Structure formats: structure tokens, C-alpha cells
Amino acid sequence: MAEPASVAAESLAGSRARAARTVLGQVVLPGEELLLPEQEDAEGPGGAVERPLSLNARACSRVRVVCGPGLRRCGDRLLVTKCGRLRHKEPGSGSGGGVYWVDSQQKRYVPVKGDHVIGIVTAKSGDIFKVDVGGSEPASLSYLSFEGATKRNRPNVQVGDLIYGQFVVANKDMEPEMVCIDSCGRANGMGVIGQDGLLFKVTLGLIRKLLAPDCEIIQEVGKLYPLEIVFGMNGRIWVKAKTIQQTLILANILEACEHMTSDQRKQIFSRLAES
Amino acid sequence: MKETPLSNCERRFLLRAIEEKKRLDGRQTYDYRNIRISFGTDYGCCIVELGKTRVLGQVSCELVSPKLNRATEGILFFNLELSQMAAPAFEPGRQSDLLVKLNRLMERCLRNSKCIDTESLCVVAGEKVWQIRVDLHLLNHDGNIIDAASIAAIVALCHFRRPDVSVQGDEVTLYTPEERDPVPLSIHHMPICVSFAFFQQGTYLLVDPNEREERVMDGLLVIAMNKHREICTIQSSGGIMLLKDQVLRCSKIAGVKVAEITELILKALENDQKVRKEGGKFGFAESIANQRITAFKMEKAPIDTSDVEEKAEEIIAEAEPPSEVVSTPVLWTPGTAQIGEGVENSWGDLEDSEKEDDEGGGDQAIILDGIKMDTGVEVSDIGSQGGPKHWKNGADAPIILSDSEEEEMIILEPDKNPKKIRTQTTSAKQEKAPSKKPVKRRKKKRAAN
């Protein structure tokens, strides 16, 4: 009842905020305001709706909704800051209204705390390495942030090496800082990436797609031949296979995956498997 | 923004791939990327796409007074700009070196070769001549700016039409395009630059390097030629030593390439001319497909996938049995397990012992030799396949390491790192006592052989 009313009111008023639930999966543009579920009822036709006062504290039940990338809180509503599709994830357990975010596509990376990225060491100055991660500033990496590193036992890192690490500090006011150990002090796969192999760059959306838990592409690629892959959230992928030919094929497949439908992809994989 | 640095592993990979005659996008050594030429609505405006490298060329003209020492010749002015959208490294004040080099090359290629008849640009001797200005803008940088820019310049010049002028005595009449059709420029020939990138001190060469290849190249040779096989400009940069026959070979290749590109240019100009004459729609808007999303389109890369499986089989056959992708951990000693292949062994020549070993873990065979000293006892104890066999079969068995300094060390390949042996020795010290005996036993066997 509230939705058609609000839609009608929207056409009358012009720039009325839309309900987030109705826009799920559709393209939203920056500047749009979205209403959260419990606000829809409040914003009925005209705005002033009379509701019976209730003495129960339950009346003002607020649901905790998490604002993901591409959205910003603006008063009681959500303001869209990136263009893309609106997505929502139900809360796994307990209370909370879930997460809303905008699925957008871009190539330029902005450091985010907790992201695992591949960086290139550009300079060694005293106790820290300067690592280029594709952002506006090089990240700093202390030599003590490697597993088993002490003041006497320094890690063997040269300028030009590839590093897989995660950000501990990444905001717009400071230069980002990264480490190659997790909170327990273990490397957990991070550190210097081996000598051979090929590094190439793709869009950020493709990386997120490939890192999704149920990604078919990686499983299919793994069936072709033995390989090693490292994905960095900054759009960089490092691959290594037994021969250069195989590595090149891998790199081209992954780059092309972005532009292929799943049928085309299956075709290519079957052709590779039988050749 | 600073340019993204080139990592060591990328450089190594690219050089190794070039040694095996493989390029990143599957091209052959002498192949050019796809060239696409599109024209704008105005005469003299064109965009040339060489793979992903894009250059926009625009020609304009103006009536000015001539230079004092060249009273009867028109003026040509070339300008190449590296737009900030071409690459993150291009900033307003930054790219001076590259810019100067490219501009000089463009000028030498087009001005000094006299491809345009400047005498025909004269209107009134000593008073009025045409000044032709060619502006080139680099829209996207994916390697080989020079070639794309030279093609864009010559296409724009061929496409351009200047207003018609008539001189009657002292009267000069300049006609607008509506009064009289504009007149094309008088172009003698079409010089086109072809770039050759050299790697490993001139051993390997590639035509039309893309951005990654340009980063790792040693030197660059640019030959500007026209279809009559006349060399207009030749420039070698990077300080590499080139042999005479290399340069001659490059010029032959350039001749072939220039002929192809000139054909492409003439065809494109002809098509555009036809469309304009027939009154059809032309311009950049028309060259973009309608009602289709082209942002998610990528050209097919001609990667050779034919012998992938053969090579894989060769590798597998050499290291029998075929290794599983996910291997189970191998327990060497309580507390030490191994998963996977490990790093490459640098102890000695292993290929002989591998080939003779008909059974036994393929991967494990390599590691067995690598840590044979540490696990000398354990190998025979566990009875892992083919452990002790190695010593019998391998006529040139790899280095036998002894952990006691008193026994003489027989090093089969003295030039391989002696340092490594030392560190291994120290780590094997704990097993000094038990492993002494088997060592002695083995030595006796060899003496018998």
C-alpha cells in the first residue's frame, strides 16, 4: 500500500526518494536518495500520517542496516555516490537489516583497510619499503612485518619484487600502510611472490567476480593444467604455469573472461581441453 | 601520477617469452596490431587506432605572410601532444623528453621528406601563403606512439581540403566552401614510420612493440619509408650496436609493412570519399555502432593453443608418475613434511638420474637428491621407492656430501655453488653419527664400480 502511493507521490513531486527494496538489482545513479524499509511507511502520501500512539517501546524499532561501498548515510536515508546496480544481502543471523551496496565497475584502485593486494617494491629506505599498489600514494611496508623477521634477520626483498600483503591503515588522509602477516603473526600466504610468472592488470569488478566463493572460472581453469595464481584486490593478477605458452594462455583467458558470456567461456575451455 | 614501476618478474617473463618468440598478445615477430582509421565530419580530422593506441589528427589552415627567406613557400607546422588521458604518467609538465623526441621525429619524417608540395601553398609571392597546421593528440598509450602518429598525420593531410583561392592581377579571392569546393593538398608521397624494438643487445627484434615490450627493450630503430621504398628518415635510439645486415633486414621488412599500411590508408580514404559523395552519413558518430554495447568488447587474441597439451605431456612423461595438482604431504622425518615440488634444486645435474629412474615419485625424485644428505638414513629406512636405487643406477651420481670434515669430499661439479654445500653440511650435523656408516658403505660401492 505504501509503495504505489509513494511511487505516485514521486511522479507528482518529481525528485522523491525511492524505496531501496524496489530498486534492488537496478541501476542507480549518484545523487539518488534511497529510503530504508521502515521509513516507507512513515513517508506515506503527503507525509503526515496519523498513527495511533503506542506506549510500547517496540514501536520505534530501528533496524541496523550496514552501508556498503557506493552508499553514504545522509540523514535517515542512503545517498548513492557511485553508479551501478544496487545489491542487498540478508543478515545471516541475529538482528540487523543486512547490507546494502552498489556494484560498480572501475579500474582505478583506492586502498581500503583489510584488502589483500599485490604491490611492487619501488624503494627501500631505512626500515621501510615503499610499495606501489596502484593508488595515489605508495604504501609503506616495514621490514618487521614479515613472518619470522627480526632486527637481525631481515627479509630478502629487492626493489622490483612483488609483494602480497594486506592493508592495516588505509584512509584518505594518510599514506596507506601494509603488512605481510596476519594478526597471529603468521604469513598465511602473504609475503614476497616468487620469481617467475606474469603480472597483469584487470578491472576491479573482474577480481571480485573471480574471488567469489562459487566462481566457476577458477575451477575450470584449474582442471586444464597445474598453475599458481595470486589475486590482488587492486586489479593485479599474478599467474604462473609450467611453460610460458601456458602462462600466456592463462593470462589471456582471464582477461577475456570479463567480456565473455558463460557459454562462450565453456566453448573456449572445451576447445582448449581437447586440443 | 608516477608511472607504475616494472616488476622484476614481469621483465624476466617478457624477455624469456621473447627468446621463445612469443608475444603477450599472440602476434608473430613481424606482425602489426589491427589498424583502424575513422574520419570525422570535417575534412582533415581522423582517429587512428593501432591496437589500443589511439591518435587524433586534425589539420587546419590559415593565410599568413611567408617567411622572409622563403617567400614563395607555404609554412608547415606539426605538433604532437601527449594528452593526460593517454597514460597516468603523462602530466602537464612531465613528459618533456619523450615529447621532444616524438616531435622531432615527426618533423623530420614529414617536413624534411618534402611529402607536401609547399610551393603549391603559395598564394601571392612574398605576401600571402597558406600555413598548414597539423595537430596530433595521443588519446591512449599502449605502445608505439610514433607509428600511430605518423599514420594519423599523413591520413589527416591526405583527407584535408583547403579553401579555393583565385588570383587575378592584384586581386585575391578566397572562396568559401559553399561557393567553390575546397581543394585537396598536393601530396607527393606518404612517409610512414615503422618501429623495431631490439632486445638482448640486438639479438631479438620485434615490430610494433606494445607498452610492456617497450619497457623492457634495449633500443628502438625507427625507419620512415614510403611505398616507393624511399627511406625518408631513420633513427636509432637506446645506444644499441646494430650490424649492417640487421639494418638492411629491417628496411626490407619496413618496405613490406609500409606497402600494406599505404594500401589500407588509400582504401580508407576512398571509402570515406565514396560515402560523402553518395550523401551517406559520415563522421565519428557513424563509426560507432548503434544499439550495441561496445564497451564490453575485446578483440580476439591469436594465442597459439595448439601444442599446449603436447608440452604438458612431455613434462609429465619426463617426471613420472604424472603429478597430481594437490599432492599429499610426504613425511620425511617426524616433524618435517613436504608438500609440492619445492624450489629448484641447485645441487647438480639431475636429468640423468631422472631419466634412468623408471619408477618412483617423479617430483619426489628431485627432492630426494636435494636433501639426500639430511635424510640419508631415513630414505633407506622408509624404503621410499627408488631411494637407494639412485646410487646404483646413476653413473654420474650427484654430489655426495659428507657431514664429517675429515672424510674427503668428492665434488663432481666444482663450479656449482660450493657455498650451498657448506650450509647443508652444518644443518646435517645433528645426524652425524648415524649417517656416517651408510656414507662409507656407498663409497665402497662406487669404488667397486
UniProtKB/Swiss-Prot annotation, chain A:
Cytoplasm as a keyword of this entry, yes or no, is yes
Gene Ontology cellular component list: cytoplasm; cytoplasmic exosome (RNase complex); cytosol; euchromatin; exosome (RNase complex); nuclear exosome (RNase complex); nucleolar exosome (RNase complex); nucleolus
N-acetylalanine, modified sites: 2
Q: Which domain of life is it from?
A: Eukaryota
Q: Where is this cross-link: Glycyl lysine isopeptide (Lys-Gly) (interchain with G-Cter in SUMO2)?
A: 151
Question: Can you name one GO molecular function term for this protein?
Answer: 3'-5'-RNA exonuclease activity
Name the Gene Ontology biological process terms: CUT catabolic process; DNA deamination; exonucleolytic trimming to generate mature 3'-end of 5.8S rRNA from tricistronic rRNA transcript (SSU-rRNA, 5.8S rRNA, LSU-rRNA); isotype switching; mRNA catabolic process; nuclear polyadenylation-dependent rRNA catabolic process; nuclear-transcribed mRNA catabolic process; poly(A)-dependent snoRNA 3'-end processing
Q: Provide this UniProt record's keywords sorted from A to Z.
A: Acetylation, Cytoplasm, Disease variant, Exosome, Isopeptide bond, Neurodegeneration, Nucleus, RNA-binding, rRNA processing, Ubl conjugation
Question: Do you know which InterPro entries this protein is assigned to?
Answer: Exosome_RNA_bind1/RRP40/RRP4, KH_dom_type_1, KH_dom_type_1_sf, NA-bd_OB-fold, RRP40_KH-I, RRP40_N, Rrp40_S1
| Intracellular or extracellular location(s) | Cytoplasm; Nucleus, Nucleolus; Nucleus
Q: Gene3D superfamilies of this UniProt entry?
A: 2.40.50.100, K Homology domain, type 1, Nucleic acid-binding proteins
Chief place of localization = cytoplasm
Q: Does the keyword S-adenosyl-L-methionine apply?
A: no
What Pfam families does the record point to?
KH_6 (PF15985), RRP40_N_mamm (PF21261), RRP40_S1 (PF21262)
**Its biological function?**
Non-catalytic component of the RNA exosome complex which has 3'->5' exoribonuclease activity and participates in a multitude of cellular RNA processing and degradation events. In the nucleus, the RNA exosome complex is involved in proper maturation of stable RNA species such as rRNA, snRNA and snoRNA, in the elimination of RNA processing by-products and non-coding 'pervasive' transcripts, such as antisense RNA species and promoter-upstream transcripts (PROMPTs), and of mRNAs with processing defects, thereby limiting or excluding their export to the cytoplasm.
**PANTHER family of this UniProt entry?**
EXOSOME COMPLEX COMPONENT RRP40 (PTHR21321:SF1), PNAS-3 RELATED (PTHR21321)
- Name the family: Belongs to the RRP40 family.
* Disease tied to this protein: Pontocerebellar hypoplasia 1B: A severe autosomal recessive neurologic disorder characterized by a combination of cerebellar and spinal motor neuron degeneration beginning at birth. There is diffuse muscle weakness, progressive microcephaly, global developmental delay, and brainstem involvement.
Q: How does it assemble?
A: Component of the RNA exosome core complex (Exo-9), composed of EXOSC1, EXOSC2, EXOSC3, EXOSC4, EXOSC5, EXOSC6, EXOSC7, EXOSC8 and EXOSC9; within the complex interacts with EXOSC5 and EXOSC9. The catalytically inactive RNA exosome core complex (Exo-9) associates with the catalytic subunit EXOSC10/RRP6. Exo-9 may associate with DIS3 to form the nucleolar exosome complex, or DIS3L to form the cytoplasmic exosome complex. Exo-9 is formed by a hexameric base ring consisting of the heterodimers EXOSC4-EXOSC9, EXOSC5-EXOSC8 and EXOSC6-EXOSC7, and a cap ring consisting of EXOSC1, EXOSC2 and EXOSC3.
Q: What is this protein called?
A: Exosome complex component RRP40
Please give the organism. Answer: Homo sapiens
Source taxonomy: Eukaryota, Metazoa, Chordata, Craniata, Vertebrata
